[in-house]
A protein has these predicted regions:
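His-enriched metal-coordination microenvironments in redox/metal-binding proteins
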Residues: 55-60, 66, 101, 105, ...
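Histidine-centered metal-chelating micro-motifs
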Residues: 52-54, 89-104, 174-176, 203, ...
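Positively charged n-region of N-terminal signal peptides that target proteins for export
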Residues: 1-4
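A beta-strand edge to alpha-helix "cap/lid" segment located at domain peripheries
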Residues: 81, 197-198, 203-206, 216-217, ...
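Glycine- and acidic-residue-biased ligand/ion/polar-headgroup-sensing regions
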Residues: 60-78, 182-200
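Bacterial N-terminal signal peptides
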Residues: 6-15
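A short, N-terminal "cap"/entry segment at the start of jelly-roll beta-barrel domains
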Residues: 19-45, 50-53, 75-77, 81-169, ...
């Protein structure tokens, strides 16, 4: 009798509202691997195998993302219709963050990128020579803005009140370059093979695509290209980071 009453009560009771899924912090999402963190950035190397997907995860701050290889993914933002995102190898994107989503890779190849969380408020966004942020007018991209010299081109991508991002492409015969940064700068290798680095106070390294480095303001960094293949990199300079010496 009691069992019959319980079944009847369950049938007659109003249905409970469905619980919304809870997003995990980005650092807890298993496809996101933290590779660098300081007062300005948290940098994640992201890899999603073919026909796999991330967990629902939260983006709480603005961030940059740059594709390593071509990308074709479904961006499922919580509470919004799904959208397809197609990116070329080395294409840079920017997001204001403050949402949760799932990145679903329905293609037959892995999806790889570098996600760069920006830990300071960014303020106004300006495209310079590339439309990184759709709908934002590009600034004048003149020869004086674009740095071109023998074997190398350096093209400003976009900037905010806090950062400036540029993309450099180097010819195979660009065997060695030395860079002096005037602000703390994030370096991301986008293309190349066996690029070697020499930075004062740090052990020499051999970089592979997707590797990142933090270059201190005022430091000299020398890069060698022993394979004599074309290579490319992204730099993100952080305004106000001149005194950042502890990383």
């Amino acid at each position: 009798m009691k069992r019959s009453f319980l079944v009847l009560a369950l049938l007659l009771s109003p249905s409970l509202p469905a619980q919304a899924p809870v997003a995990v912090p980005i650092a807890k999402e298993p496809h996101h691997h933290l590779v660098l963190e300081n007062d300005y950035v948290r940098v994640f190397r992201v890899s999603v195998p073919a026909h796999d997907a991330t967990l629902l995860h939260q983006h709480d701050v603005p961030y940059l993302y740059i594709s390593l290889g071509p990308a074709d993914v479904i961006n499922a933002v919580q509470g919004k219709p799904e959208a397809r995102i197609v990116m070329a190898d080395g294409q840079l994107g920017y997001s204001l963050g403050h949402f949760a989503h799932i990145a679903r890779n329905e293609s037959d190849v892995p999806f790889n990128n570098v996600t760069i969380e920006l830990l300071k408020p960014q303020g106004e966004v300006q495209n310079i020579c590339v439309e990184v942020v759709p709908g934002v007018e590009k600034q004048t991209c003149s020869r004086s803005v674009m740095e071109k010299r023998s074997g190398m081109s350096n093209v400003p991508q976009f900037q905010t009140d806090e950062i400036s991002a540029s993309m450099a492409r180097l010819d195979p015969d660009a065997e060695q370059i030395t860079m002096t940064q005037y602000t703390g700068t994030l370096f991301v290798l986008l293309g190349g093979s066996g690029i070697q680095t020499m930075v004062k106070g740090k052990p020499d390294q051999t970089l592979v695509v997707g590797d990142v480095m933090w270059l201190l303001a005022g430091s000299n960094a020398t890069f060698y290209n022993p394979a004599h293949k074309a290579w490319s990199y992204l730099t993100v300079g952080f305004k106000g980071s001149e005194a950042l010496h502890k990383y």
